[in-house]
Amino acid sequence: MDLFAQNNLSCLLTPSLRKRYHILIKDHLNVAPKLAQGVKAISHHQSAWANTQAAWRFLDNDSVGYVQLNLPLMQAARQELAASESSYGLVAHDWCRNNYLGHDCKLDRIQMSHDKDVGYELFASLLLNANTGQPLAPLGLDLKAKQGTFRCRDMEPQEPMPHLEQLVDRIEWQESLPLQKTLIHIIDREADSAPHLRQLTGVKWLTRGKKNTSVKYDNEFISLEKLAAKVKSEVKGVVDFKGKEAYLFVGEAEVVLQRKSERGLVNAPTVRFVVSTLCNEKGEQLAQWFLLSNVADVDALTLATWYYWRWSIESWFKVLKGHGFQIEHWQQETAPRIFRRLIVSSMACVLTWKLYNDNSPEAEKLKPFLIKLSGRLTKRSKPITHPALLAGLWVFLQLTEVLNNYSNEEIEMYKSVMSSYFGQSV
């Protein structure tokens, strides 16, 4: 039984491509160094060269459609969301630039900002558990290149769109999905655009506002920074901020989503303004967020907590770029190949997150065992981390492969040879 059947996920690829997809996902359950970021070979029945060639053929195969590759991710998202106890699902949206400055063989790179910032731009949406903030599955992937924007829901590249139009289009698509729970779309300050937010009719959103952004409060236009000084905040608890304890203060007010430059606008919607402030024990301000949201049926502390959890997508980008997969060092030479491998890597993340979020007695025993195998030193306050789980999973998969393919006599012989070099403890 492959991992798709094991997890009740559909895969519409042909049997041979489905088998290779399964193998590639397992091959990506590891933490790769920069200089060895290629597809690893877990099977002892196949040489590394043969495995690399098979991976190349898969990633370069036009029959491997993005929609087909993404189907298991979408089904995993529905399953994990349905299993959560909350009536909400959080969707964090963000962009991530992947720089390939030294990859001259990638002829379809684009300039993303300055002349040395060339590569492919990823736009991703990450589904989070509304009770815990833990990641569940990607709920949309776009990769922008010279040919256009490759999307996990389209067979061909699409015409590129400005960021906010791309965001609105993504949200409208997600709202059409049969997820059966209310989605809360969480976006950073880039989404602080009143016209675009007003465009999201019937959609629940939460965004961070810029300090100089103006809203209408008590029939007057005022910046969020000045309004925050007027709002009475109350301490709501102690949270972790950059490894240290901080006091969380939360206050809120009702405002009209209308800018000072839009004085002639009528029927602008009323939204909530939430100011979230972190202070140390001396009362010194460590951080402050000005939040705007049209979610009415949760308290201000919940909104502040939900925005705090938006950081999960940043953590995922770190896994993709540095702490796990080294995407900026991948040697595939075209955006379609990079995009296919990105979807494969995302599926590996989904399985790792599923294990991380599993609180069953069996999973609670397995996770510390995998951390031990990883050789990682983790914080006492957070003994289990996603990168450490990935590293431990790879060692465990290699162990099971050894036990399945070598006899006890062979293993004892190898131990004896090793002991002659490294001592009897081997």
Language-model regions: role of each:
Residues 1-106, 114-121, 126-426:
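Single, function-defining residue in the core of a domain
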